[in-house]
Swiss-Prot record:
Name of the protein in question: Putative RNA-binding protein EEED8.12
Keyword set, alphabetical order: RNA-binding
Annotated CDD domains: RRM_II_PABPs
Molecular function terms from GO: poly(A) binding
Signal peptide feature range: none
Family matches, as InterPro entries: Nucleotide-bd_a/b_plait_sf, RBD_domain_sf, RRM_dom
Ranges of residues in domain RRM: 61-138
Region spans: Disordered: 142-166
Amino acid sequence: MAPTTVIADNNCNEESSNSFEMEIEAESAILEQIQNKMAKNLESAAYVPPTEEEQKAIDAKSVFIGNVDFNSTIEEVEEHFKGCGHIVRTTIPKDKFTKKQKNFAYIEFDDSSSIENALVMNGSLFRSRPIVVTAKRTNIPGMGHGVRGSSRGTFGRGRGAARGAPGRQQTVVVKYVYVNGPNRGGRGGRGRRFNPY
């Protein structure tokens, strides 16, 4: 009986090896995407907003930039202000509903001395538009604009407050009701008593 000769197919082995390597690369790419997504979620979950004092310190080193072109990029804004000092962070807020950029920005510098240099840029042309540069103000929680001009007349007389004006504090008028009526015939006005409401 003649011996059987087995010839190995090298092409099949190479194709199997290549297919296995492609599967490993694909799985590695998927795992990397998952890890990146988890890292972003952890970063957002670990974010702790600054305290009031910390926010004041940040704002003391920041400027507000108005009349910024809607298509501006952070890189372009930083390029325009790079000569003012070392920039820590540049923010162009977006509308929370439309997700479109607003027409203003904020720049935080490493040192408060850079603010004076940045204020010199007020009125300069950025994307062919004159921009407004001012020192950033710290927003104080609870200090809304609706209470301005309505402190007078809050108790009793009602002067200084617009009736029915939206967003303004309304005047509360306290009326007094005489229990037994004014005692006009009493001596020295005695007997005149009143209770609120």
